[in-house]
Amino acid sequence: MKLFEKRIAYKPFEYPEYYTEGWLKQAQAFWLHTEIPMSGDVKDWNENLTPAEKHVVGNILLGFAQTECAVSDYWTGMVTKWFPKYEIIQMAMLFGAQETVHATAYSYLNDTLGLTDYEGFMHEPAIASRIDALTEVRSDYDHEQLAKSSTARRDVGKSLAIFSAFTEGVALYSSFAVLYSFQLNNKLKGIGQQMKWSVRDEALHSKMGCQLFRHMCDEYPELKADAKTAIIEAAKLTLDMELNFIDKIFEKGDLENLTAYDLKHFMHKRINEKLKELGYEPHFAYDVSASSRLDWFEHLASGVEHADFFSIRPTSYSKANEGEDWSDIF
């Protein structure tokens, strides 16, 4: 089997895990923003959030829609061109489509809460660097060039690893954690539920993209060493951007149930985990005690059956299997 050799027939699948673990799980978890009531969040925004809390939430939400547009384009425009296997193509197309659901949902949250200054937000240095990083990690080879050229495979491998591990697996996680933490105080339930579904989507996308990189390394063993330096440098850059972003959103102080210090060390831990998922050793030291105070978020990202910490009924990865009536929750 070779990842870059075009197969005419739809089946048999040569890489069935991208159907069963990628496409199928995403299809089972499909959701829309219209499923989530927001009236309670509007009341919280107008009556129950402090100025510091509103500053944090507003800064995060304004950046979400823009970043998701870049992510969607990568799956549908790049991955489908590189890997001419239907099981991978249909997974990438569905992942890209789900990112448009995220972008629409985040825009809906912004509109609902009256957050409309997208242009001003994009001029913030901490935000602009995030957007730039998302759009720069790409490569314009096609599958025929990848089959023949080790240079092409190195460039695409680096791009795929950086995108999957750090863009999908790290870059928005500090924001997800902050927004979901409000449910500790029974606030912003609609936003919290959207974060829950978004995190599970992004965790799946990151997992499958990292797996695709490892498949490349299995078939072309020289790739892992060739790409290592660039991937470690990208990890450092991603972490620096996240730490700067955390400073920006916490510039008016910590939240009641979440500190900037704890979140920063959780992000160190998170990026180490993604390096391991790519097949590399952890690279960053961190305060284990501080990162452990966000263990509740690890459960959210895992996508496995668990009892939710914030009075939401037990869930599994598949939203369709949750059997929940959201009107009961809200």
Which residues does each PLM region occupy?
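Non-heme di-metal
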Residues: 1-330
